C-alpha cells in the first residue's frame, strides 16, 4: 500500500508557505498484531497546527486530524469497515496501534455507527473544534440566560459553534470577525451583534453593542482585541482562552502588543482559564459529541464547511485558514 504524506520541509517563519511542506510517497509495511490500516476520507486543517508545528522535527509528517476508513485490522477494537477519527497527520494512509500518535495526545476513536450524520462533521462540530466550543463555553464560561457572551474568531470552526451554543443557552451574543460577508452569515445563524475588526473601532463598537458590559468572553485570537473585550467585562466575568491566532504568525519584528489587562482582572474579580481540549477533557470526549449531535439533529446547531478538493491542496487550505479565508470548518476531501 502506497501512502502520500506532507512532511515538514522547513520551519514556518511568519505566515506559512507552501514550500515549507513537501509531498512525499512511501510504501507502507504490512500491519502487525494490534495495528490497523486506515485510508483518509476527510482531512482537517486548523489554526492550532501553526502553534504545534514547532514540536515537530524536520521530515516528520505534518500534524492533523482526519476521518478515515479502516481497510485492514489486527486490532479487535478497530474492525475493518468502520470509520475512525484520529490524529493521523497529513497522510492518505496510516498504520495505527490505537494509541495517541503525536504531540496532541489525541487517541483515535471509532465513529458511532448509528449517528446518521455526515462523516465530515467529526472534524468540525462533532470533533475537536466542537468539543472546544462545548467545554470551553459551558465548563469555563458557564453562561447563564440573559448574560452577554463575546466570541472572537467568530467565523471560524470554533467561534461560530460557540455563538450558537450561547444562543441555545439564552444569551446575547456578539461575534467579532474579519469581513462583512462573514458578519451577515453570523447574523443569519442568530448572533445578535457582529463587529468587523478590520473596518470598525473595536472599543466604540463594543460600547454600542453591549453598553451594560460583558459577562463571558471566549477568546480565540488574543492581542489588543482581547484587551478591549476584557476591559469591558462585568464583575465576576468568565474568560475561556482557546487560542491566540493573532500571534501564531508573528516574528520578533512584528510581535503583537496589547494593553495590560491585570487591573481589570483584579478589580472585577474575573476568572480566566486557558485550556487544551484534548488534554483537559479527553475523559469526557463523548459527552460533547453526544450533546452536539442532539442539537444538530434538532436543528439548533448549524454546520458550515469550506471544502477543498484534492489532497495535494492541503498546504493551500492551511494557509487559507491562517488568513481567515474559511467559513466555519475547513475540510479537505482527498
Each model region followed by its residue ranges:
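C-terminal capping/lid region of NAD(P)-dependent oxidoreductase domains
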Residues: 3, 300-307, 315-334
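Glycine-rich beta-strand-centered segment in the early N-terminal region that forms part
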Residues: 27-45, 49-93
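NAD(P)H dinucleotide-binding glycine-rich loop of Rossmann-like/cofactor-binding domains
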Residues: 65-69, 80-153
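N-terminal Rossmann-like NAD(P) cofactor-binding module of classical short-chain dehydrogenase/reductase
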Residues: 85, 150, 195, 215-218
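Mid-domain Rossmann-like dinucleotide-binding core that forms the NAD(H)/NADP(H) cofactor-binding site
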Residues: 123-200
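A generic alpha-to-beta junction signature in SAM-dependent methyltransferases
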Residues: 143, 210, 233-234
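Short amphipathic alpha-helix with an adjacent loop that forms part of the alpha/beta core around
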Residues: 201-212
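Glycine-rich phosphate-binding loop and adjacent beta-alpha segment
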Residues: 224-300, 333-334
